Amino acid sequence: MQVKESLRGLSPYQPGKSIEEVKRQYGLPEIIKLASNENPYGSSPSAKAAIAAELDRLAVYPDGCARTLREKVAKHLGVKETQLLFGNGSDEVVQILCRAFLEPGANTVMAAPTFPQYRHNAIIERAEVREVPLVDGRHDLEAMLAVIDENTRIVWICNPNNPTGTYVNDTELRAFLDRVPRHVLVVVDEAYYEYATAPDYPQTVPLLNEYEQLVVMRTFSKAYGLAALRVGYGVASEMLIRAVEPAREPFNTSTIAQAAAAAALDDQAFIRACVERNRAELERYYRFCEENGLKYYPSQTNFLFIDFGLDGDEVFRYLLERGVIVRSGQALGLPTGVRVTVGTKEQNDRVLELVSQLLREKQLA
């Protein structure tokens, strides 16, 4: 048997180490996991109650149109219900768009490093991947424009960007959209939208009225704390959604996921509280880095990339052996640092204690 050529040599996504895996490996009773940009404060109590209310319906297929969730998201965003595409996480929305637009002979443009699933799915569809290096951790929009041609189908903008946490501002995004050829789909991935507090962070959903080739992606996995349930969505013109819907699998979001997401969306007080606490803790990391001469990218997310000037794997292992899981920059295309999810105050206390210890041992402090 032979798999198709585009899969040969293609590695599956490598998630961070699980808590149980690290406990077993190092014999540690407690682990702090700050590797996957999950919400350290969990999810809304309303979402948990909504899950419990659906437990007697597990034998029944979910609503394939996600009607209740669709109504709530449409109202929340101020768009039509027919402008929404739901996925089993925003990962699946990426997959659907690649399935719908990419093929041999086509190309797709993205930053490097950025969220890896854009590249991964493009390779599976046998499209050419054109990666444009970040400049100071930010998208180089001019260079991205320069590599677009008549065969370009999709341009990806992860905003804020993963793994750097940097963002494209409103003026920059509008200028970019004005210059992108109309045959090119522009996907703005806003997985961390709720965490972005910069005054000039773009409000992209209203731009759908001006740019028919624009798609905005969001997720319930990050600020809403529903990563285990896998719910994400894309927002675009009605025409574009109609065109790509055939590429979506039926029943792709579960009943409990739809119910939890709908309830979570109603609890914006929970989101505001999480964002406020995240921003306060992020400021603590900034002060620590500045006091200790560590470089970092100012972040509009719930994570921070810190450049230690050391092998990222070494920093990763040092923290791992002491019960803290972060993400090595070696796996992210930024080899001299680590990406740290901003945890609770207590979790961050432990991280900063260990990093201080590491800096003393390396005589870097």
Swiss-Prot record:
Gene Ontology biological-process annotations: L-histidine biosynthetic process
Names of the cofactor(s): pyridoxal 5'-phosphate
EC number(s) on file: 2.6.1.9
Modification N6-(pyridoxal phosphate)lysine occurs at: 222
Pathway: Amino-acid biosynthesis; L-histidine biosynthesis; L-histidine from 5-phospho-alpha-D-ribose 1-diphosphate: step 7/9
Gene Ontology molecular-function annotations: histidinol-phosphate transaminase activity; pyridoxal phosphate binding
Keyword Aminoacyl-tRNA synthetase: no
Catalytic activity: L-histidinol phosphate + 2-oxoglutarate = 3-(imidazol-4-yl)-2-oxopropyl phosphate + L-glutamate
Pfam families: Aminotran_1_2
Claim: Protease is one of the keywords in the record: no
InterPro entries in the cross-refs: Aminotrans_II_pyridoxalP_BS, Aminotransferase_I/II_large, HisP_aminotrans, HistidinolP_aminotransfase, PyrdxlP-dep_Trfase, PyrdxlP-dep_Trfase_major, PyrdxlP-dep_Trfase_small
Keywords assigned: Amino-acid biosynthesis, Aminotransferase, Histidine biosynthesis, Pyridoxal phosphate, Transferase
Subunit structure: Homodimer.
Family, per entry: Belongs to the class-II pyridoxal-phosphate-dependent aminotransferase family. Histidinol-phosphate aminotransferase subfamily.
Protein name, as recorded: Histidinol-phosphate aminotransferase
Naturally occurring in which organism (per UniProt): Geobacillus kaustophilus (strain HTA426)
Gene that this polypeptide is encoded by: hisC
